[in-house]
Structure formats: structure tokens, C-alpha cells
Amino acid sequence: MKNKDAVFKALNDSTRRLILDELSERNEMTLYELTIRLITKHSLDISRQAIAKHLSLLDEAELVKTTRKGKYRVLTFNKEPLRNLLEDWLE
């Protein structure tokens, strides 16, 4: 139940949903790349620090994974929590 609540909390914000949209469209991005895409594509007035806070909530819900590639931290969209949530309801 706790993870379900975390998923719903994470999805309850339009900026976090845009982040997931961008990661779904182009998986594996750095925070810098994600910030640039959100600012240019969606005309958001948002800082990297604000995006990092949104990412921490997405991470708590296990919707975003961060891995190291060289000196960069790369973000990916983990769709499993959403699949599990829907499967529980649809079974």
C-alpha cells in the first residue's frame, strides 16, 4: 500500500508527469538534458534544483532510476510500479 501511495503522490503533479513523459519519449537523460528539454519544449520556468526535488519524489515511488555512466548520472523511467498497480486492479 505504501508504494501505491508513493506512486499516486508522484503522479499528482503536472511537472512530474512531464518529466515522466520526457523520459518515456527519450529514456536515459542527465539532469541537465532533462532540464533543457523541459524549458525549451514545454516553456517551463524551472531550475535544475526544482527538477531535482521532483525527481526525489519520483525516486521514492521507484518511477525513476539513476545510474552512473562515467562522470554523469543518467535518469531512466521505471514503468514497473505503474504496471504492478494496474495489474493489481485488473486481476
Q: Model-found features: residue ranges?
A:
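Beta-hairpin "wing" of winged helix-turn-helix
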Residues: 59-69, 76
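A generic local structural motif
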Residues: 5-6, 61
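Single-residue recognition of alpha-helix boundary sites
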Residues: 27, 65, 89-90
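Short, hydrophobic-biased segments on the C-terminal half of alpha helices
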Residues: 55-56
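Phospho-regulated, low-complexity intrinsically disordered regions of nuclear gene-regulatory
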Residues: 78-91
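Hydrophobic transmembrane alpha-helix bundles
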Residues: 68-73, 86-89
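N-terminal helix-turn-helix DNA-binding core of bacterial DNA-binding proteins
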Residues: 2, 9-10, 14-47, 72-81
